[in-house]
């Protein structure tokens, strides 16, 4: 059903690219979302050492691991215009690095008015001015993507300007570019009072809107807010490793199969290396359950 199951490469820390990709394969993964930090350099590097990047590409191929995306996230609403301009320069470098690694997908963050952390909510994110600033910056990123023949992976995230599936659909319509792809993470779409245990419509409606553009499906979980360790005064859910929370993964996997045209890579993240085996087992169990159910339904229809 899903032939590509992988992980954020940063969750597996090893001193060399060869050891990194061997470890990734050893956990049963056949793909990764890569980050330049895995090469011992900044996530937004100042330069591209092609020898180092080619070495990483060879190591991935040797281990049988496909690089399906390269992270290039920075705050598109950075109020420090000098730093923002420099980050666009670094984005262009990463577009080149992605090509060396054999992927055409570079992931971005749509940004926030909160200046200390690009993944933290700010009430100004919903303003028309924030939307204009974000689309202007996104167009600049699209121009870079066009030059280097890569695609931009945008993730709807409650803490950012593109905070839900409707925002993502609006962005695609307004910029009218085939180079926008969606990184789909249902854990990032739930905001109380919507409950991941019962409100599967959040996933279904989002995939009905965006399914044709989904390039990667992220897999983390929503922490049970009733547990003291995850009581959050921000009004948002906290996240845990896949299988340790309350997200209905059976519904998620079945809707991916139903509404996404091709089998997109499932990428685990938001976990420690020690949690990887349990989360991998959990994902395979859900995938096998859905496959068995679908075979049973097919037999009944014959």
Task: Identify the meaning behind each predicted range.
Residues 1-104, 139, 177, 181, ...:
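N-terminal pre-domain/capping segments
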Residues 3-5, 70, 136-241, 246, ...:
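Acidic/histidine-rich catalytic cores of soluble enzymes
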Residues 8-12, 35-39, 72-75, 111-113, ...:
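Active-site beta-loop-alpha junctions enriched in small/polar residues
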Residues 18-19, 59-62, 78-184:
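Active-site acidic/histidine proton-transfer and metal-coordination neighborhood
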Residues 24, 112-121, 225-235:
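Short, flexible, mixed-charge acidic loops at enzyme active sites
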Residues 24, 32, 60, 98, ...:
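Conserved, mostly hydrophobic/aromatic
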Residues 44-55, 82-90, 122-133, 159-163, ...:
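Alpha-helix N-cap and loop-to-helix initiation/capping positions
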Residues 234, 241, 250-252, 257-266:
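H/E-rich (His + Asp/Glu) clusters that bind or coordinate divalent metals
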């Amino acid at each position: 059903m899903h032939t590509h199951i992988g992980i954020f490469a940063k969750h597996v820390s090893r001193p060399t690219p060869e050891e990194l990709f061997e470890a990734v394969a050893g956990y049963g993964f056949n793909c990764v979302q890569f980050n330049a930090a895995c090469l011992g350099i900044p996530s937004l590097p100042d330069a591209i050492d092609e020898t180092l990047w080619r070495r990483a590409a060879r190591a991935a191929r040797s281990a049988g691991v496909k690089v399906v995306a390269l992270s290039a996230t920075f705050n598109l609403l950075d109020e420090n215009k000098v730093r923002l301009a420099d980050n666009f320069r670094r984005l262009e470098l990463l577009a080149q690095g992605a090509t060396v690694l054999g992927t055409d997908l570079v992931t971005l963050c749509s940004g926030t008015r909160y200046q200390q952390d690009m993944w933290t909510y700010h009430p100004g994110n919903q303003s028309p001015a924030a939307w204009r600033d974000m689309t202007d910056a996104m167009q600049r990123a699209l121009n870079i993507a066009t030059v280097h023949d890569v695609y931009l992976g945008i993730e709807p995230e409650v803490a950012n300007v593109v905070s839900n599936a409707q925002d993502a659909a609006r962005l695609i319509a307004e910029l009218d570019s085939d180079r926008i792809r969606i990184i789909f993470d249902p854990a990032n779409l739930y905001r109380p009072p919507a409950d991941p245990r019962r409100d599967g419509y959040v996933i279904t409606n989002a995939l009905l809107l965006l399914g044709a553009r989904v390039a990667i499906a992220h897999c983390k979980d929503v922490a049970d807010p009733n547990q003291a360790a995850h009581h959050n005064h921000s009004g948002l859910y906290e996240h845990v490793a896949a299988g340790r929370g309350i997200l209905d993964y059976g519904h998620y996997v079945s809707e991916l199969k139903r509404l996404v045209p091709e089998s997109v890579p499932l990428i685990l993240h938001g976990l420690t290396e020690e949690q990887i085996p349990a989360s991998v087992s959990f994902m395979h169990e859900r995938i096998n359950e859905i496959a068995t159910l679908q075979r049973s339904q097919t037999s009944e229809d014959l």
